[in-house]
């Protein structure tokens, strides 16, 4: 089962805005840029550099795993755009370790989504 089209992020203007955004999540194996959007659902894009992973098979495996984790953990997020950039070494992690990294990212995104106290 693939991620729904409404969760795909493809607009270059949004990519540029995400990269300029001050809201970031850094991990050893990935960087995530995020910001609120006007759509009522979360949207995500995964970027994997050819210089870090030469084989398309590896890049596709990473992309499938990341999308599976996002579908599982981002289900209760609202109105946020996320750009995930994968770094070297991500492929060597176990699936459970990858889930832990994305769980931390999801908690950070829920803080963004939560109403601010007055």
Curated annotation (Swiss-Prot):
User: Does the record's keyword annotation contain RNA-binding?
Assistant: yes
A GO BP entry: tRNA 5'-leader removal
Print the keywords alphabetically: Endonuclease, Hydrolase, Nuclease, RNA-binding, tRNA processing
**Gene Ontology annotations for the cellular component aspect, listed alphabetically:** ribonuclease P complex
**Could you tell me which InterPro entries the record lists for this protein?**
Ribosomal_Su5_D2-typ_SF, Ribsml_uS5_D2-typ_fold_subgr, RNase_P, RNase_P_CS
Q: Does the keyword Hydrolase apply?
A: yes
Q: Name one GO molecular function term.
A: 3'-tRNA processing endoribonuclease activity
Q: EC number(s) in its UniProt entry?
A: 3.1.26.5
Reactions mediated catalytically: Endonucleolytic cleavage of RNA, removing 5'-extranucleotides from tRNA precursor
| Complexes and interactors | Consists of a catalytic RNA component (M1 or rnpB) and a protein subunit.
Spell out the family assignment given in the record's similarity comment.
Belongs to the RnpA family.
What's the stated role of this polypeptide?
A: RNaseP catalyzes the removal of the 5'-leader sequence from pre-tRNA to produce the mature 5'-terminus. It can also cleave other RNA substrates such as 4.5S RNA. The protein component plays an auxiliary but essential role in vivo by binding to the 5'-leader sequence and broadening the substrate specificity of the ribozyme.
Please report the name of this protein according to its UniProt entry: Ribonuclease P protein component
> What species was this sequence derived from?
Mycoplasma pneumoniae (strain ATCC 29342 / M129 / Subtype 1)
